[in-house]
């Protein structure tokens, strides 16, 4: 389809060139100009004053016709009539070979005559060549003006009707943004599935990406979260498999990599809907699933695979029946997140194992130096870059109302409890910095009759999957999570994003708040809780084009449950143990923050931080102890939930051991 406009343009230009050449010939005949024949299309020039006229090998009255039949195209501009200089050897297009053969058959007869003519014209030719070198653009413009004065100009109406406008670039040529406009490019079964999914118009990233990808271009795309990147790469991927008529025996043709299991499941869900009317095989490969069952499916042949990098590399190295040598397309979704979570080495190994002749797509919400490095090793030399939001003032979507609240350390949990209780009928996501912190607050809030769900990296996969779909299908509720849920997940109608613990950097903030206000005309709210010492983080957010305003909270209306919280943590052994783990992990996560000039663990008031976890006296945390040693000692003490009195626990450097008795003078006062 992309060649049709060029063919049409070529035919119309040839037609116009024919008319222009015929007019030029009439003018040349009136001026008594003589044209000399040259072998195989060579052009000689004679000087008439300061004017140059192009000469062809054919007779004067047939010059325009013969050159047009041989496919010759001049460089005349559309708006002006120019007589341009021809190179010493004319370029021959589609029908040139036939013309050369016919001229060669007559070359012997004309050989003597031609030599004589060339010898006679030799002085003039040398003179013409010398003048050729000295001619400037201004002289050629003067020649054009002189020619125009003697040639009858065509009507403006004729110009407008005969000369089409040049097509625009790939990213801006198409005004129609409906999926129906892809009817000549996309299979009708795919369009039918898209219609059944409820989509009629393409988003900006889809509009700019799908057509180039259907042409086989490599692509590096950057767009805000919730902009529709998933369909932007799934539609071309499915079309590639359909057009190549991939069968299970051909193995894997498309590979889609996702940073987290939840995002992989979500992408697989969209792919499943898109493949409703197709017969090709597709599958999900991720950690936490049954590996032997995955290996069996790979042996049978999966045409489109959605996978996480770790499990995929495992199968590529250890599953003999996995055929990926026929791979046609590699898609890396949330490329920056894949690199952030430590899959950089796995990704490089995967790229080395895959065939080099393939189409590659990199999609991400943010562009980092690591993503650029990945693009260099995975994309071809000239990939197409699509940046939807490069020229926009804000890095977050317009429908998002976001702000921050300054809260002292000792009142953080009281603020969170009051906020969740007030918004029980809404859908909220609360982000924490560590798995143990999520686990503790999940147990605590459910214990005090405030039902919440939780997702974190230390859960078993079945639990994570069940919780994820339970929250997706809920009309209201609260999900406590780590950054494992911050990327790519399309959870419907989330009203509030609460960042209880600040993110590691502004890019992570953008991804967290991207879970709300998704899609066209999406609306949502985001709340960032900061300690007074952490207000410097706002400067980094402003540099990243994140507009934040301060929210006003009536502190008199904050629920004062501090005394009840302390009594509960004191009396309930299991909650006490969980609170210790959470406090320890919070301090460690704070110490590992990348922006140490703002999030400095030495500036923390530990007694006040301990109050937010329900402790009157802060548990002991040794930041110099290796985290692996801490985990081993914790397991040696009975796993954190059981009670086993051992010497290792009594000598633990991580936290002080307490007994089941409520009267413990080391931790609590009567």
Swiss-Prot record:
Subcellular compartments: Nucleus, Nucleolus; Chromosome
This enzyme's EC code(s): 3.6.4.13
Enzyme class name: hydrolase
Motif (DEAD box): 333-336
Region (Disordered): 31-169
Biased composition (Polar residues): 31-42, 83-105
CDD domains linked: DEADc_DDX18, SF2_C_DEAD
Domain Helicase C-terminal: 399-569
Positions bound to ATP: 223-230
Pfam families tied to this protein: CTE_SPB4 (PF13959), DEAD (PF00270), Helicase_C (PF00271)
Annotated Helicase ATP-binding domain residues: 210-385
Domain of life assignment: Eukaryota
Keywords assigned: ATP-binding, Chromosome, Helicase, Hydrolase, Nucleotide-binding, Nucleus, RNA-binding
SUPFAM superfamilies for the chain: P-loop containing nucleoside triphosphate hydrolases (SSF52540)
GO function term, MF aspect, one: ATP binding
Gene3D superfamilies: P-loop containing nucleotide triphosphate hydrolases
Keyword ATP-binding in record: yes
GO-annotated biological processes: cellular response to estradiol stimulus; maturation of LSU-rRNA from tricistronic rRNA transcript (SSU-rRNA, 5.8S rRNA, LSU-rRNA)
Record keyword Ribonucleoprotein present: no
Family: Belongs to the DEAD box helicase family. DDX18/HAS1 subfamily.
Function, as annotated: ATP-dependent RNA helicase that plays a role in the regulation of R-loop homeostasis in both endogenous R-loop-prone regions and at sites of DNA damage. At endogenous loci such as actively transcribed genes, may act as a helicase to resolve the formation of R-loop during transcription and prevent the interference of R-loop with DNA-replication machinery. Also participates in the removal of DNA-lesion-associated R-loop. Plays an essential role for establishing pluripotency during embryogenesis and for pluripotency maintenance in embryonic stem cells.
Record's protein name: ATP-dependent RNA helicase DDX18
């Amino acid at each position: 389809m992309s060649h049709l406009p060029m063919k049409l343009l070529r035919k119309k230009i040839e037609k116009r060139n024919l008319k222009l050449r015929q007019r030029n010939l009439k003018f040349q005949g009136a001026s008594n100009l003589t044209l000399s024949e040259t072998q195989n299309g060579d052009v000689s020039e004679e000087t008439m004053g300061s004017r140059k006229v192009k000469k062809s090998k054919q007779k004067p009255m047939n010059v325009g016709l013969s050159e047009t039949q041989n496919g010759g195209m001049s460089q005349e501009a559309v708006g002006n009539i120019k007589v341009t200089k021809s190179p010493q050897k004319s370029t021959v297009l589609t029908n040139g070979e036939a013309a050369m053969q016919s001229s060669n058959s007559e070359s012997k007869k004309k050989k003597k005559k031609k030599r004589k003519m060339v010898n006679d014209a030799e002085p003039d030719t040398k003179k013409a060549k010398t003048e050729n070198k000295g001619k400037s653009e201004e002289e050629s413009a003067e020649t054009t003006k002189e020619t125009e004065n003697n040639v009858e100009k065509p009507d403006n109406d004729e110009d407008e009707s005969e000369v089409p406008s040049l097509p625009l670039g790939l990213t801006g040529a198409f005004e129609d943004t409906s999926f129906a406009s892809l009817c000549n490019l996309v299979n009708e079964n795919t369009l039918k599935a898209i219609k059944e999914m409820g989509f009629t118009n393409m988003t900006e990233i889809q509009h700019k990406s799908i057509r180039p990808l259907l042409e086989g271009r490599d692509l590096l795309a950057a767009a805000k979260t919730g902009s529709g990147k998933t369909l932007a790469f799934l539609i071309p991927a499915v079309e590639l498999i359909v057009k190549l008529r991939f069968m299970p025996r051909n193995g894997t043709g498309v590979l889609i990599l996702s940073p987290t299991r939840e995002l992989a499941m979500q992408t697989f869900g969209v792919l499943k809907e898109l493949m409703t009317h197709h017969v090709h095989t597709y599958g999900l490969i991720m950690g936490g699933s049954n590996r032997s069952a995955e290996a069996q499916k790979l042996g049978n042949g999966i045409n489109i695979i959605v996978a996480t990098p770790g499990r995929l590399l495992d199968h590529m190295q250890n599953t003999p029946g996995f055929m990926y040598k026929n791979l046609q397309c590699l898609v890396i979704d949330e490329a920056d997140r894949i690199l952030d979570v430590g899959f950089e080495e796995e990704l490089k190994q995967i790229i080395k194992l895959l065939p080099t002749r393939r189409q590659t797509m990199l999609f991400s919400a943010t562009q980092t130096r690591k993503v650029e490095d990945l693009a260099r090793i995975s994309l071809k030399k000239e990939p197409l870059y699509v940046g939807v939001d490069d020229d926009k003032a804000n890095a977050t979507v317009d429908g998002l109302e976001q702000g921050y609240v300054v809260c002292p350390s000792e009142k953080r949990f009281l603020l969170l409890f009051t906020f969740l209780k007030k918004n029980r009928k809404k859908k909220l996501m609360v982000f924490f910095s560590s798995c143990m912190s999520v686990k503790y607050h999940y147990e605590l809030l459910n214990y005090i009759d405030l039902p919440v769900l939780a997702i974190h990296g230390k859960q078993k996969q079945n639990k994570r999957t069940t919780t994820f779909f339970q929250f997706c299908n809920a009309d209201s509720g609260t999900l406590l999570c780590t950054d494992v849920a911050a990327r790519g997940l399309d959870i419907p109608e989330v009203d509030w994003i609460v960042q209880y613990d600040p993110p590691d950097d502004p890019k992570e903030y953008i991804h967290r708040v991207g879970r709300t206000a998704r899609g066209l005309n999406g609306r949502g709210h985001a709340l960032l809780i900061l300690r007074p010492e952490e207000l410097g983080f706002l400067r980094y957010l402003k540099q990243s084009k994140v507009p934040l305003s301060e929210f006003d909270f009536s502190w008199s209306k904050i629920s004062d449950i501090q005394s009840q919280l302390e009594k509960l943590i004191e009396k309930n052994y299991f909650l006490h143990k969980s609170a210790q783990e959470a406090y320890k992990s919070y301090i460690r996560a704070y110490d590992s923050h990348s922006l140490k000039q703002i999030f400095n663990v030495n500036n923390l008031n530990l007694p006040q931080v301990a109050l937010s976890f329900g402790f009157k006296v802060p548990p002991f945390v040794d930041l110099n102890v290796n985290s692996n040693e801490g985990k081993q000692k914790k397991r040696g003490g009975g796993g954190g939930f059981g009670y086993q009195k051992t010497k290792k626990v009594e000598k633990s450097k991580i936290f002080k051991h307490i007994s089941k008795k409520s009267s413990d003078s080391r931790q609590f006062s009567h």
